[in-house]
Amino acid sequence: MRVLGIETSCDETAVAVLDDGKDVIVNFTVSQVEVHRKFGGVVPEVAARHHLKNLPFLLKETFKKVDPQTVDVVAATYGPGLVGALLVGLSAAKGLSISLKRPFVGVNHIEAHVHAVFLANPTLTPPFVVLMVSGGHTQLMKVNEDYSMEILGRTLDDSAGEAFDKVARLLGLGYPGGPIIDEVAKKGDPKKYSFPRPMMDEPNYNFSFAGLKTAVLYFLKKEKDYRVEDVAASFQEAVVDILVEKTFRLARNLGIRKIAFVGGVAANSRLREKVNDRAKRWGYEVFFPPLSLCTDNALMVARAGYEKAKRGIFFPLYLNADPNLSV
């Protein structure tokens, strides 16, 4: 089964073609990071306008490599995300579905990130615990044997990725904050400053990062003699400790020995280091997508679309964008 996937939920425009849920035929992504850097974050209207410019170009390049008549299913993200951005990809996918006379699958962006891990780990089977951690989301979920997903914990305020962006801005490091702090922190001491770990010891699976961000803000206002590298490393250590502790606690309490980590923050080198260390000590299997599939991409959309199509799940063409969609 050949699936064409389209992703435009935020600031990446992406098109991919995937055969049988595993063989990559085409994988194109155009990032808008440089466009939004001067704003310090993603501007929704600007993102949508760039999708309108980039998507036709990517589809044209895709169909230079793939005969459109060989596509069996068209899939696109319909939420959650920025509504204007979502509508660009969703509308294009519906148009292709009509013109090619092929079925259409709407894909949940969060579910798509989970499917990214299957591309690199084809032997992974549910049930497993997954931490979805990105600029827009921080959620702990259980993936059931039928591939349905249950949210068992979520952030009550900022996402982890949002906290990275805001602290990077406080430190004058620029945007996007996640990869910049990751790199700067390698030159710092993660034990230099003791920042709070909100909700880490509470008997639930929810998160809160707003207080940690505020603690860094007050620290910077109070202290004058500090190294940016040490602050970045100490802040990152606090975030990673919270994510690791909550995720392994959920897996332990559910009696599940397999854990996946997905989303942009799953690319963080310190998170991967501490996860792998604990998994080795505690006897868990852990799974990450490759770095290229942690951020938004269309391969994960095509993979999620494949799974639904394989089960005969298709969507009507009146499906609308849902910026607040949940799993």
Swiss-Prot record:
Its EC number is 2.3.1.234. GO terms for cellular component: cytoplasm. Gene3D superfamilies: 3.30.420.40. It is an enzyme of class 2 (transferase). It holds the Pfam family TsaD. It is found in: Cytoplasm. Its cofactor is Fe(2+). GO terms for biological process: tRNA threonylcarbamoyladenosine modification. InterPro entries: ATPase_NBD, Gcp-like_dom, KAE1/TsaD, Peptidase_M22_CS, TsaD. Fe cation binds at residues 109, 113, 296. The keyword Acyltransferase applies. The keyword tRNA processing applies. It catalyses: L-threonylcarbamoyladenylate + adenosine(37) in tRNA = N(6)-L-threonylcarbamoyladenosine(37) in tRNA + AMP + H(+). Substrate binds at residues 132-136, 165, 178, 182, 268. Keywords: Acyltransferase, Cytoplasm, Iron, Metal-binding, Transferase, tRNA processing. GO terms for molecular function: iron ion binding; N(6)-L-threonylcarbamoyladenine synthase activity. Binds 1 Fe(2+) ion per subunit. Required for the formation of a threonylcarbamoyl group on adenosine at position 37 (t(6)A37) in tRNAs that read codons beginning with adenine. Is involved in the transfer of the threonylcarbamoyl moiety of threonylcarbamoyl-AMP (TC-AMP) to the N6 group of A37, together with TsaE and TsaB. TsaD likely plays a direct catalytic role in this reaction. PANTHER family: TRNA N6-ADENOSINE THREONYLCARBAMOYLTRANSFERASE, TRNA N6-ADENOSINE THREONYLCARBAMOYLTRANSFERASE, MITOCHONDRIAL. Belongs to the KAE1 / TsaD family. This is tRNA N6-adenosine threonylcarbamoyltransferase. It comes from Thermotoga neapolitana (strain ATCC 49049 / DSM 4359 / NBRC 107923 / NS-E). The gene is tsaD.
